Amino acid sequence: DFRLFTMDNVAEEIAFRARVIRDCDTKPVIAHAWGGGAITCAQLGGMAFDDWKNAKVFDKWGFSAFPRDAKSASTLAMGCDATRCAADGKEFWQSELTAGMWGTGLHQGGRMDDDTFLNLSLESIRHGAKGLLYWQFRKERFGAEFGGYAMTDYDGGPTNLSRCAGRLGEMLKRNGDVLSAGALPRAEVAVLFSIRSYLAVWLSNGRHENKAAIDAVNGYYRVLWEENIPVDILHEEFFGDLSGYRLIILPCACAVSPAFAEALKTYIAGGGTVLSDPYFGAFDKDMQLSYAVPGYGFAEIFGAREDDIREGDAREIVYRSETHRVTGLLMNETFRDVAADALATYADGTPAILSHKWGRGRAILSGVSLGNSCAEGALISDDILADGQNRQSTLARRVVLDLCADCGVRPNPCDAPGVKASVYETDDGNGCVILINSAAEPAEGRVRLNASYAACSEELGAPHASLADNALRFRLAPHESAVVRLLAKR
Protein backbone atom coordinates (compact mmCIF):
# COMPACT_ATOMS: atom_id res chain seq x y z
CA ASP A 1 0.00 0.00 0.00
CA PHE A 2 2.83 2.41 0.81
CA ARG A 3 4.40 1.89 -2.63
CA LEU A 4 1.09 2.58 -4.38
CA PHE A 5 0.61 5.61 -2.12
CA THR A 6 4.06 6.86 -3.12
CA MET A 7 3.16 6.56 -6.81
CA ASP A 8 0.02 8.61 -6.21
CA ASN A 9 2.02 11.12 -4.17
CA VAL A 10 4.56 11.58 -6.97
CA ALA A 11 1.74 12.07 -9.49
CA GLU A 12 0.09 14.70 -7.27
CA GLU A 13 3.40 16.50 -6.74
CA ILE A 14 4.16 16.81 -10.46
CA ALA A 15 0.55 17.84 -11.15
CA PHE A 16 1.04 20.68 -8.66
CA ARG A 17 4.29 21.73 -10.36
CA ALA A 18 2.64 21.63 -13.79
CA ARG A 19 -0.16 23.90 -12.52
CA VAL A 20 2.37 26.39 -11.17
CA ILE A 21 4.18 26.47 -14.52
CA ARG A 22 0.92 26.97 -16.43
CA ASP A 23 0.02 29.85 -14.11
CA CYS A 24 3.23 31.57 -15.22
CA ASP A 25 3.50 30.60 -18.90
CA THR A 26 1.34 29.45 -21.80
CA LYS A 27 3.93 27.21 -23.43
CA PRO A 28 3.43 23.40 -23.37
CA VAL A 29 4.54 21.64 -20.20
CA ILE A 30 6.70 18.66 -21.09
CA ALA A 31 8.31 15.91 -18.99
CA HIS A 32 9.69 12.43 -19.35
CA ALA A 33 10.16 9.22 -17.39
CA TRP A 34 13.45 7.94 -16.08
CA GLY A 35 15.53 5.07 -17.49
CA GLY A 36 13.18 3.22 -19.83
CA GLY A 37 10.01 4.09 -17.97
CA ALA A 38 8.20 2.11 -15.31
CA ILE A 39 7.86 -1.02 -17.44
CA THR A 40 11.65 -1.52 -17.59
CA CYS A 41 12.51 -0.22 -14.10
CA ALA A 42 14.00 -3.06 -12.06
CA GLN A 43 13.69 -1.08 -8.81
CA LEU A 44 10.09 -0.01 -9.28
CA GLY A 45 9.21 -0.64 -5.64
CA GLY A 46 11.99 1.64 -4.48
CA MET A 47 11.48 4.36 -7.08
CA ALA A 48 7.66 4.04 -7.15
CA PHE A 49 6.51 5.96 -10.21
CA ASP A 50 3.72 5.27 -12.68
CA ASP A 51 4.12 6.66 -16.22
CA TRP A 52 0.40 6.49 -16.96
CA LYS A 53 -0.51 8.62 -13.93
CA ASN A 54 2.36 11.04 -14.46
CA ALA A 55 1.79 11.53 -18.21
CA LYS A 56 -1.80 12.67 -17.68
CA VAL A 57 -0.79 16.11 -16.39
CA PHE A 58 1.62 17.04 -19.20
CA ASP A 59 1.07 18.29 -22.74
CA LYS A 60 3.79 16.04 -24.16
CA TRP A 61 5.49 12.99 -22.71
CA GLY A 62 8.70 11.04 -23.20
CA PHE A 63 11.24 8.73 -21.62
CA SER A 64 14.98 8.23 -21.39
CA ALA A 65 16.83 5.10 -22.46
CA PHE A 66 20.45 3.99 -22.35
CA PRO A 67 20.73 0.70 -24.26
CA ARG A 68 24.31 -0.51 -24.40
CA ASP A 69 24.09 -2.14 -27.81
CA ALA A 70 21.68 -3.33 -30.49
CA LYS A 71 21.02 -6.52 -28.48
CA SER A 72 18.84 -4.34 -26.23
CA ALA A 73 16.63 -3.21 -29.12
CA SER A 74 13.50 -5.13 -28.12
CA THR A 75 13.65 -3.69 -24.59
CA LEU A 76 14.03 -0.21 -26.08
CA ALA A 77 11.06 -0.85 -28.38
CA MET A 78 8.99 -2.11 -25.44
CA GLY A 79 9.77 1.07 -23.51
CA CYS A 80 8.72 3.15 -26.53
CA ASP A 81 5.40 1.34 -26.92
CA ALA A 82 4.71 1.66 -23.19
CA THR A 83 5.48 5.39 -23.36
CA ARG A 84 3.27 5.80 -26.43
CA CYS A 85 0.38 4.11 -24.60
CA ALA A 86 0.99 6.10 -21.41
CA ALA A 87 0.89 9.31 -23.48
CA ASP A 88 -2.60 8.24 -24.62
CA GLY A 89 -2.63 10.07 -27.93
CA LYS A 90 -0.33 12.93 -26.93
CA GLU A 91 2.91 13.46 -28.80
CA PHE A 92 5.81 11.60 -27.22
CA TRP A 93 9.54 12.04 -27.70
CA GLN A 94 12.54 9.87 -27.10
CA SER A 95 13.69 12.51 -24.65
CA GLU A 96 17.09 11.21 -23.55
CA LEU A 97 18.49 8.52 -25.81
CA THR A 98 22.11 7.50 -25.34
CA ALA A 99 24.33 9.58 -27.58
CA GLY A 100 26.28 6.45 -28.36
CA MET A 101 29.02 6.42 -25.74
CA TRP A 102 28.59 4.20 -22.69
CA GLY A 103 30.47 4.54 -19.43
CA THR A 104 31.67 7.20 -17.02
CA GLY A 105 34.80 8.15 -15.19
CA LEU A 106 37.53 5.54 -15.50
CA HIS A 107 35.07 2.86 -16.62
CA GLN A 108 34.54 3.64 -20.29
CA GLY A 109 32.79 1.43 -22.83
CA GLY A 110 33.77 3.43 -25.89
CA ARG A 111 31.64 4.77 -28.72
CA MET A 112 29.04 2.80 -30.65
CA ASP A 113 29.48 2.15 -34.34
CA ASP A 114 27.23 3.89 -36.85
CA ASP A 115 25.01 0.85 -37.42
CA THR A 116 24.15 0.53 -33.72
CA PHE A 117 23.51 4.26 -33.36
CA LEU A 118 21.11 4.26 -36.32
CA ASN A 119 19.45 1.04 -35.18
CA LEU A 120 18.55 2.45 -31.76
CA SER A 121 17.50 5.82 -33.16
CA LEU A 122 15.21 4.38 -35.83
CA GLU A 123 13.82 1.79 -33.39
CA SER A 124 12.54 4.71 -31.32
CA ILE A 125 11.03 6.46 -34.35
CA ARG A 126 9.26 3.38 -35.68
CA HIS A 127 7.56 2.79 -32.33
CA GLY A 128 5.96 6.21 -32.29
CA ALA A 129 8.53 8.74 -31.08
CA LYS A 130 8.06 12.07 -32.87
CA GLY A 131 11.49 13.39 -31.96
CA LEU A 132 14.92 12.38 -30.70
CA LEU A 133 17.00 14.07 -28.02
CA TYR A 134 20.39 12.59 -27.14
CA TRP A 135 22.31 12.66 -23.87
CA GLN A 136 24.56 14.43 -24.49
CA PHE A 137 26.56 16.79 -26.73
CA ARG A 138 29.92 16.99 -24.90
CA LYS A 139 31.60 14.96 -22.19
CA GLU A 140 30.89 16.12 -18.67
CA ARG A 141 33.98 17.69 -17.07
CA PHE A 142 33.21 16.82 -13.44
CA GLY A 143 30.73 14.93 -11.29
CA ALA A 144 29.73 11.28 -11.16
CA GLU A 145 29.32 11.05 -14.95
CA PHE A 146 32.52 12.84 -15.95
CA GLY A 147 33.94 11.78 -19.29
CA GLY A 148 30.85 9.91 -20.42
CA TYR A 149 27.78 9.83 -22.63
CA ALA A 150 29.09 12.26 -25.26
CA MET A 151 28.29 12.55 -28.95
CA THR A 152 31.28 14.81 -29.65
CA ASP A 153 34.94 14.76 -28.70
CA TYR A 154 36.40 16.42 -25.60
CA ASP A 155 36.36 19.91 -27.14
CA GLY A 156 33.06 19.50 -28.98
CA GLY A 157 34.75 18.30 -32.15
CA PRO A 158 33.11 15.79 -34.51
CA THR A 159 33.05 12.02 -34.05
CA ASN A 160 31.46 9.21 -36.02
CA LEU A 161 28.40 9.64 -33.79
CA SER A 162 27.88 13.35 -34.46
CA ARG A 163 28.33 12.80 -38.20
CA CYS A 164 25.84 9.94 -38.07
CA ALA A 165 23.35 12.09 -36.14
CA GLY A 166 23.76 14.75 -38.82
CA ARG A 167 22.86 12.31 -41.59
CA LEU A 168 19.88 11.08 -39.59
CA GLY A 169 18.73 14.65 -38.93
CA GLU A 170 18.87 15.53 -42.62
CA MET A 171 16.79 12.46 -43.44
CA LEU A 172 14.20 13.44 -40.83
CA LYS A 173 13.97 16.96 -42.27
CA ARG A 174 13.28 15.57 -45.74
CA ASN A 175 10.76 12.97 -44.57
CA GLY A 176 9.29 14.49 -41.45
CA ASP A 177 5.99 15.12 -43.22
CA VAL A 178 5.38 11.40 -43.74
CA LEU A 179 6.92 10.21 -40.48
CA SER A 180 4.83 12.72 -38.51
CA ALA A 181 1.52 12.33 -40.31
CA GLY A 182 1.82 8.78 -41.59
CA ALA A 183 -0.26 6.09 -39.95
CA LEU A 184 1.22 2.85 -38.65
CA PRO A 185 -0.95 -0.30 -38.46
CA ARG A 186 -3.19 -0.48 -35.40
CA ALA A 187 -2.14 -3.02 -32.77
CA GLU A 188 -4.24 -6.18 -32.70
CA VAL A 189 -2.27 -7.68 -29.80
CA ALA A 190 -1.92 -6.20 -26.32
CA VAL A 191 0.46 -7.12 -23.50
CA LEU A 192 -0.50 -6.36 -19.90
CA PHE A 193 1.67 -4.23 -17.63
CA SER A 194 0.48 -5.06 -14.10
CA ILE A 195 2.20 -2.56 -11.86
CA ARG A 196 0.77 -4.29 -8.77
CA SER A 197 2.40 -7.54 -9.88
CA TYR A 198 5.72 -5.76 -10.44
CA LEU A 199 5.51 -4.56 -6.83
CA ALA A 200 4.64 -8.06 -5.61
CA VAL A 201 7.79 -9.41 -7.28
CA TRP A 202 9.86 -6.53 -5.86
CA LEU A 203 8.61 -7.24 -2.34
CA SER A 204 8.91 -11.02 -2.53
CA ASN A 205 12.69 -11.32 -2.69
CA GLY A 206 15.56 -10.10 -0.57
CA ARG A 207 17.23 -8.29 -3.45
CA HIS A 208 14.45 -5.70 -3.75
CA GLU A 209 14.33 -5.82 -7.52
CA ASN A 210 11.68 -6.89 -10.02
CA LYS A 211 13.85 -7.99 -12.94
CA ALA A 212 11.88 -11.24 -13.30
CA ALA A 213 8.69 -9.26 -13.97
CA ILE A 214 10.43 -7.21 -16.67
CA ASP A 215 11.69 -10.38 -18.32
CA ALA A 216 8.20 -11.90 -18.20
CA VAL A 217 6.80 -8.98 -20.18
CA ASN A 218 9.78 -8.61 -22.49
CA GLY A 219 9.84 -12.26 -23.51
CA TYR A 220 6.33 -12.14 -24.94
CA TYR A 221 6.92 -8.69 -26.40
CA ARG A 222 10.14 -9.83 -28.04
CA VAL A 223 8.43 -12.69 -29.90
CA LEU A 224 5.96 -10.23 -31.41
CA TRP A 225 8.62 -7.58 -32.06
CA GLU A 226 10.75 -10.05 -33.99
CA GLU A 227 7.76 -10.71 -36.28
CA ASN A 228 6.91 -7.01 -36.79
CA ILE A 229 3.56 -7.47 -35.04
CA PRO A 230 2.40 -4.14 -33.51
CA VAL A 231 1.76 -4.25 -29.76
CA ASP A 232 -0.06 -2.03 -27.29
CA ILE A 233 0.98 -2.07 -23.62
CA LEU A 234 -2.08 -2.16 -21.36
CA HIS A 235 -1.91 -0.65 -17.89
CA GLU A 236 -4.20 -2.48 -15.46
CA GLU A 237 -5.89 0.76 -14.37
CA PHE A 238 -5.96 2.72 -17.65
CA PHE A 239 -7.02 0.31 -20.36
CA GLY A 240 -10.21 1.47 -22.08
CA ASP A 241 -12.14 -0.73 -24.51
CA LEU A 242 -10.51 -4.16 -24.98
CA SER A 243 -12.78 -5.42 -27.75
CA GLY A 244 -10.49 -4.23 -30.56
CA TYR A 245 -7.73 -6.68 -29.62
CA ARG A 246 -7.64 -10.15 -31.10
CA LEU A 247 -5.23 -11.41 -28.41
CA ILE A 248 -4.32 -10.14 -24.93
CA ILE A 249 -1.24 -11.59 -23.20
CA LEU A 250 -0.98 -11.56 -19.41
CA PRO A 251 2.65 -11.88 -18.25
CA CYS A 252 3.34 -11.83 -14.51
CA ALA A 253 -0.30 -11.21 -13.55
CA CYS A 254 -0.08 -12.55 -9.99
CA ALA A 255 -1.53 -9.35 -8.49
CA VAL A 256 -3.59 -8.08 -11.41
CA SER A 257 -6.08 -5.37 -10.46
CA PRO A 258 -9.70 -6.39 -9.83
CA ALA A 259 -10.96 -3.85 -12.37
CA PHE A 260 -8.84 -5.35 -15.14
CA ALA A 261 -9.81 -8.89 -14.13
CA GLU A 262 -13.49 -7.97 -14.50
CA ALA A 263 -12.84 -6.33 -17.86
CA LEU A 264 -11.11 -9.52 -19.02
CA LYS A 265 -14.21 -11.55 -18.20
CA THR A 266 -16.29 -9.31 -20.46
CA TYR A 267 -13.62 -9.44 -23.17
CA ILE A 268 -13.42 -13.26 -23.18
CA ALA A 269 -17.19 -13.71 -23.00
CA GLY A 270 -17.50 -11.45 -26.04
CA GLY A 271 -15.11 -13.54 -28.13
CA GLY A 272 -11.62 -12.43 -27.10
CA THR A 273 -8.59 -14.65 -26.50
CA VAL A 274 -6.18 -14.38 -23.57
CA LEU A 275 -2.88 -16.12 -22.82
CA SER A 276 -1.85 -15.98 -19.17
CA ASP A 277 1.26 -16.81 -17.19
CA PRO A 278 0.86 -19.08 -14.13
CA TYR A 279 -0.27 -17.75 -10.75
CA PHE A 280 -2.94 -15.48 -12.23
CA GLY A 281 -4.70 -13.41 -9.57
CA ALA A 282 -2.88 -15.07 -6.69
CA PHE A 283 -3.25 -11.82 -4.71
CA ASP A 284 -6.68 -10.25 -4.25
CA LYS A 285 -7.74 -6.60 -4.34
CA ASP A 286 -6.14 -6.02 -0.92
CA MET A 287 -2.89 -7.74 -1.97
CA GLN A 288 -3.69 -10.67 0.32
CA LEU A 289 -3.25 -14.23 -0.89
CA SER A 290 -6.35 -15.46 -2.69
CA TYR A 291 -8.34 -18.45 -1.44
CA ALA A 292 -8.00 -20.09 -4.86
CA VAL A 293 -5.64 -19.74 -7.82
CA PRO A 294 -6.45 -18.61 -10.46
CA GLY A 295 -8.06 -15.79 -8.50
CA TYR A 296 -11.09 -13.57 -9.13
CA GLY A 297 -13.19 -16.59 -10.15
CA PHE A 298 -10.98 -17.38 -13.14
CA ALA A 299 -10.77 -21.10 -12.29
CA GLU A 300 -14.06 -21.44 -14.15
CA ILE A 301 -12.80 -19.36 -17.07
CA PHE A 302 -9.46 -21.18 -17.44
CA GLY A 303 -11.11 -24.53 -16.75
CA ALA A 304 -8.75 -25.62 -13.94
CA ARG A 305 -7.40 -24.84 -10.49
CA GLU A 306 -3.81 -24.75 -9.40
CA ASP A 307 -2.66 -27.91 -7.62
CA ASP A 308 0.95 -26.97 -6.88
CA ILE A 309 3.49 -24.32 -7.87
CA ARG A 310 7.24 -24.02 -7.44
CA GLU A 311 10.22 -22.18 -8.81
CA GLY A 312 12.09 -23.96 -11.53
CA ASP A 313 14.79 -23.42 -14.10
CA ALA A 314 14.14 -26.09 -16.74
CA ARG A 315 11.26 -28.30 -17.87
CA GLU A 316 10.57 -30.51 -20.85
CA ILE A 317 7.23 -29.74 -22.47
CA VAL A 318 5.53 -31.51 -25.36
CA TYR A 319 3.70 -29.22 -27.78
CA ARG A 320 2.17 -30.53 -31.00
CA SER A 321 4.15 -33.78 -30.78
CA GLU A 322 7.50 -31.99 -30.34
CA THR A 323 9.47 -31.93 -27.09
CA HIS A 324 10.89 -28.55 -26.04
CA ARG A 325 13.36 -27.97 -23.23
CA VAL A 326 12.39 -24.67 -21.63
CA THR A 327 14.85 -22.81 -19.39
CA GLY A 328 14.79 -19.60 -17.42
CA LEU A 329 11.43 -20.38 -15.87
CA LEU A 330 10.11 -18.30 -13.00
CA MET A 331 7.19 -20.59 -12.13
CA ASN A 332 6.11 -24.20 -12.71
CA GLU A 333 2.41 -24.77 -12.06
CA THR A 334 0.42 -28.01 -12.04
CA PHE A 335 -3.36 -28.26 -12.16
CA ARG A 336 -6.37 -30.11 -10.75
CA ASP A 337 -10.10 -30.13 -11.48
CA VAL A 338 -9.18 -29.80 -15.14
CA ALA A 339 -12.06 -29.19 -17.55
CA ALA A 340 -9.88 -27.53 -20.20
CA ASP A 341 -8.06 -29.11 -23.12
CA ALA A 342 -4.31 -29.69 -22.83
CA LEU A 343 -2.56 -27.54 -25.41
CA ALA A 344 0.80 -28.85 -24.18
CA THR A 345 1.91 -31.39 -21.57
CA TYR A 346 4.81 -31.92 -19.22
CA ALA A 347 7.05 -34.92 -19.87
CA ASP A 348 4.91 -37.04 -17.53
CA GLY A 349 1.81 -36.37 -19.63
CA THR A 350 0.08 -33.97 -17.22
CA PRO A 351 -1.22 -30.66 -18.62
CA ALA A 352 1.31 -27.84 -18.98
CA ILE A 353 -0.70 -25.35 -21.07
CA LEU A 354 -4.50 -25.34 -20.92
CA SER A 355 -7.00 -24.04 -23.47
CA HIS A 356 -10.61 -23.50 -22.45
CA LYS A 357 -13.59 -22.09 -24.32
CA TRP A 358 -15.62 -19.68 -22.21
CA GLY A 359 -18.50 -17.64 -23.57
CA ARG A 360 -17.63 -16.85 -27.16
CA GLY A 361 -13.92 -16.57 -26.37
CA ARG A 362 -10.94 -18.62 -25.30
CA ALA A 363 -8.73 -18.58 -22.20
CA ILE A 364 -5.25 -20.15 -22.31
CA LEU A 365 -3.35 -20.69 -19.06
CA SER A 366 0.31 -21.65 -19.16
CA GLY A 367 1.82 -23.59 -16.28
CA VAL A 368 5.25 -22.16 -17.11
CA SER A 369 6.36 -18.56 -17.46
CA LEU A 370 6.79 -18.51 -21.23
CA GLY A 371 7.94 -14.90 -21.33
CA ASN A 372 10.83 -15.54 -18.96
CA SER A 373 12.00 -18.35 -21.23
CA CYS A 374 12.67 -16.03 -24.17
CA ALA A 375 13.52 -12.68 -22.58
CA GLU A 376 16.26 -10.45 -23.90
CA GLY A 377 17.61 -10.07 -20.37
CA ALA A 378 18.53 -6.43 -20.97
CA LEU A 379 17.90 -3.21 -19.09
CA ILE A 380 18.04 0.25 -20.65
CA SER A 381 18.72 2.14 -17.43
CA ASP A 382 21.49 2.23 -14.88
CA ASP A 383 19.60 1.02 -11.81
CA ILE A 384 20.99 -2.54 -11.72
CA LEU A 385 22.95 -4.64 -14.16
CA ALA A 386 21.16 -7.15 -16.36
CA ASP A 387 21.80 -10.81 -15.62
CA GLY A 388 23.17 -11.33 -19.12
CA GLN A 389 20.82 -14.23 -19.88
CA ASN A 390 19.52 -13.78 -23.42
CA ARG A 391 17.13 -16.71 -23.84
CA GLN A 392 15.43 -18.00 -26.98
CA SER A 393 12.61 -20.46 -26.33
CA THR A 394 11.21 -22.14 -29.41
CA LEU A 395 8.18 -23.18 -27.35
CA ALA A 396 7.23 -19.63 -26.37
CA ARG A 397 7.71 -18.45 -29.93
CA ARG A 398 5.58 -21.23 -31.39
CA VAL A 399 2.77 -20.91 -28.86
CA VAL A 400 2.48 -17.14 -29.24
CA LEU A 401 2.69 -17.11 -33.04
CA ASP A 402 0.30 -20.04 -33.38
CA LEU A 403 -2.20 -18.15 -31.24
CA CYS A 404 -1.72 -15.02 -33.36
CA ALA A 405 -2.49 -17.05 -36.48
CA ASP A 406 -5.52 -18.68 -34.84
CA CYS A 407 -6.85 -15.25 -33.85
CA GLY A 408 -6.37 -13.73 -37.30
CA VAL A 409 -3.64 -11.27 -36.29
CA ARG A 410 -2.01 -9.61 -39.31
CA PRO A 411 1.16 -11.56 -40.14
CA ASN A 412 4.65 -10.17 -40.57
CA PRO A 413 4.68 -7.92 -43.68
CA CYS A 414 8.38 -8.63 -44.23
CA ASP A 415 9.63 -12.00 -45.51
CA ALA A 416 13.30 -11.53 -44.57
CA PRO A 417 14.18 -13.11 -41.18
CA GLY A 418 15.82 -10.69 -38.76
CA VAL A 419 14.64 -7.55 -40.56
CA LYS A 420 12.47 -5.09 -38.65
CA ALA A 421 10.12 -3.19 -40.95
CA SER A 422 7.61 -0.39 -40.37
CA VAL A 423 5.43 1.08 -43.11
CA TYR A 424 4.07 4.64 -42.79
CA GLU A 425 1.24 5.62 -45.13
CA THR A 426 -0.40 9.06 -45.47
CA ASP A 427 -3.79 10.17 -46.74
CA ASP A 428 -2.20 11.88 -49.76
CA GLY A 429 -0.76 8.59 -51.02
CA ASN A 430 2.86 8.98 -49.91
CA GLY A 431 4.72 6.71 -47.53
CA CYS A 432 7.96 5.68 -45.86
CA VAL A 433 9.47 2.35 -44.90
CA ILE A 434 11.98 1.97 -42.06
CA LEU A 435 14.18 -1.13 -42.36
CA ILE A 436 16.59 -2.47 -39.73
CA ASN A 437 18.64 -5.60 -40.32
CA SER A 438 19.33 -6.99 -36.84
CA ALA A 439 21.30 -9.95 -38.19
CA ALA A 440 25.05 -10.31 -38.71
CA GLU A 441 24.40 -11.52 -42.27
CA PRO A 442 23.12 -9.72 -45.36
CA ALA A 443 19.33 -9.73 -45.75
CA GLU A 444 17.23 -9.64 -48.88
CA GLY A 445 13.46 -9.69 -49.15
CA ARG A 446 10.16 -7.90 -49.63
CA VAL A 447 7.83 -5.77 -47.53
CA ARG A 448 4.14 -5.94 -48.45
CA LEU A 449 2.48 -2.57 -49.05
CA ASN A 450 -1.20 -1.71 -48.74
CA ALA A 451 -1.16 0.53 -51.81
CA SER A 452 0.71 0.93 -55.08
CA TYR A 453 3.23 3.73 -55.52
CA ALA A 454 4.79 5.50 -58.50
CA ALA A 455 8.40 5.21 -57.34
CA CYS A 456 10.67 5.01 -54.32
CA SER A 457 13.78 6.87 -53.20
CA GLU A 458 16.52 5.81 -50.79
CA GLU A 459 16.67 8.38 -47.99
CA LEU A 460 19.09 6.66 -45.62
CA GLY A 461 21.43 3.74 -46.22
CA ALA A 462 21.77 1.83 -49.46
CA PRO A 463 19.00 -0.79 -49.43
CA HIS A 464 18.89 -1.34 -53.24
CA ALA A 465 15.17 -0.57 -53.09
CA SER A 466 12.68 -1.21 -55.88
CA LEU A 467 8.90 -1.59 -56.23
CA ALA A 468 7.10 -4.63 -57.64
CA ASP A 469 3.63 -6.12 -57.14
CA ASN A 470 2.60 -3.85 -54.23
CA ALA A 471 5.79 -4.68 -52.39
CA LEU A 472 9.12 -3.03 -51.65
CA ARG A 473 12.13 -5.14 -52.54
CA PHE A 474 15.36 -4.50 -50.63
CA ARG A 475 18.84 -5.78 -49.90
CA LEU A 476 20.60 -4.82 -46.67
CA ALA A 477 24.16 -5.29 -45.45
CA PRO A 478 24.71 -6.87 -42.00
CA HIS A 479 23.25 -4.62 -39.26
CA GLU A 480 22.34 -1.96 -41.83
CA SER A 481 19.42 0.41 -41.26
CA ALA A 482 17.64 2.20 -44.07
CA VAL A 483 14.73 4.51 -44.83
CA VAL A 484 12.91 4.42 -48.18
CA ARG A 485 10.43 7.08 -49.34
CA LEU A 486 7.35 5.90 -51.25
CA LEU A 487 6.10 8.38 -53.85
CA ALA A 488 2.41 8.72 -54.63
CA LYS A 489 0.91 8.14 -58.04
CA ARG A 490 -0.43 11.35 -59.65
PLM regions: where:
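Aromatic- and acidic-residue-enriched segments that line the glycan-binding/catalytic groove
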Residues: 1, 43-49, 206, 292-295
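Active-site neighborhood of glycoside hydrolase catalytic domains
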Residues: 1-32, 45, 53-57
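Distinct, well-ordered alpha-helical segments
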Residues: 39-54, 243
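Carbohydrate-binding surfaces of carbohydrate-active enzymes
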Residues: 15, 23, 27, 55, ...
